[in-house]
Amino acid sequence: MNISRRRLLQSGAFVAAAPALNAAGLNVVTLAQAQAAPEWRHALSLFGDIKYPADFKRFDYVNPDAPKGGIARQISIGTFDNFNLAVAGVKGTIAPAVGLIYETLMARSQDEATTQYGLLAESVSHPDDHSWVIYRLRKDAKWNDGKPVTPEDVLFSMESLKKYSPMYSSYYKHVVKAEKVGPHDIKFTFDAPGNRELPTIVGELTVLPKHWWEGKDSEGRKRDIGATTLEKPLGSGPYAIRDFVAGRSVTLERVKNYWGANAPTRIGQNNFDEMRFEFFRDTTVSLEAFKADQADWIIESSAKSWATAYDFPAVTEKRVVLEEFPINDSGRMQGFAFNIRRELFADKRVRRAFNYAFDFEEMNKQLFYGQYKRINSYFEGTELASSGVPVQREFDILKEVYGDIPPEVIAKPYENPVGGDPEKVRENRRQSTRLLKEAGYEVRDQKLVDKNGKQVSVEFLIDSPPSERIVLFYKPSLERLGIEVTVRTVDTAQYQNRLRSFDYDIVTEVWGQSLSPGNEQRDFWGTEAADVPGSRNTVGIKNPVVDKLIDKIIFAKDRETLVAATKALDRVLLWHYYVVPQFTYGFSRYARWDRFSHAPLPKYGRSGLPSLWWYDKEKADKIGKRS
């Protein structure tokens, strides 16, 4: 999967049942016993060629002579109370800075869609049927306390992450055995052959230091990897936590004598001596902090702010640069997600009625300055998005999983209702009323009631002011149908707790999608994940056809089949109206103080911040000292 799957998955936690691995008491066998003559590879690619040869020195898109030094200050919205990655999404709120502390077995190339090269691992081997994979660790890979990274660390990481993290438990559910098969070699055996993606996703395993987690803290207490912690963790990565203020800030410093400084996948990257993460409760305060030069860059998610809030003197004086970076590495679905565990939303007609009530076109004009487009796919922005009617391979796949394909799935393309003018809005309202009546609801005294005469009521659960603006625009349309609508804004901790326990009617959800989807689809839409606390199956989907299509994606033997199966899944999800699709932009918006530089950015790297940039002293001197 491109876009680093970890980045997508760590946006939330999800789970499915999986057998636990036991790293204790493993028998060490010889490599010859594990595989008579393994073919060792320096890279993995799901589909397509590998660009860089085994002896490559660096990625083409980095500046190998980038100066090291300087400070980079960035903004995070929300708070944190945890540095333990193993319980992210289950307990506490993880600090985003933790991602720069640890490393994975492989590292993604940002100028290829689906290719990984060795990081902690120097080479990898797997058979043609992808039934197992062996990773060979670099002999010079070290933790930042000087101890070597070992197979025992890798086994401990797999076991711990599967045990304590719903995200990893589901993600690695097909890994049924992990064993040390040589001084530097770890073999992972899978539950079935044919899953091309499994060697790659094992390569994305975050490796944790066993000796540190099994040791004691500064007060003599045994560490617990199953609990949250604010003890500064040991990593193998280019940065370490220097200091922090709980919930407010984290400062990282570049590790002196970092083992991987000259590794091909690291040269020209991680150039800042210090990186500071400042946490703000909301975007209004964070923008003011940026304007006051208390942060070096800000990612702007608000169309209104992008259109109206960046006219302060530093912009007109060109001391602050506004840039948009294309999002080529992923697709997305963002929408109002129904909790179909609730009786009201178990009926597809009700869900569809809510979609008819959403006037995106008017919202786009009034709130977003016409910047957005409506999302029409769960894989929006990629070749994986369904369109038209299913043909050829996609049709055949739908026939295989359905038997008799429902007419609506094949008769016409999925289309969202279009509003924007009074006549269209009135027609959409009539359609909503018709669907609700078919579902057994009727209007009495301007209230939509069920068969017992109880008014239909829904609560939108949100955790940010920008989300509140959107819901408040949508709210009157639902109220005109006779629905009682409550908007509940809570803090991040409450929001996460209610998500984990499925205590909501409707939430805004975002599912990031890679260019090569696979096992994570089970966690997004699969039956096994539907009722497990912490699942990313926010909707609660339990659909045998969806499960079959996910398997078609996972076990696709070629790119053509994967694309066709993904389009089929997209089509089925759309026609079940599990969400009210919202909107997308296709670019990331950044404002930054002009004290940094970068080489030409790779196609799949977005902004490249912070890893590909460096502090430019000449530019910094021109715009003056920081506040």
Question: What would you call each of these model-derived segments?
Answer:
Residues 36-129, 159, 234:
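N-terminal lobe/hinge region of extracytoplasmic solute-binding protein
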Residues 177-180, 242-253, 278-342, 349-353, ...:
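Extracellular/periplasmic solute-recognition and catalytic clefts
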Residues 56, 246, 286, 299, ...:
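Ligand/substrate-recognition segments at binding pockets and active sites
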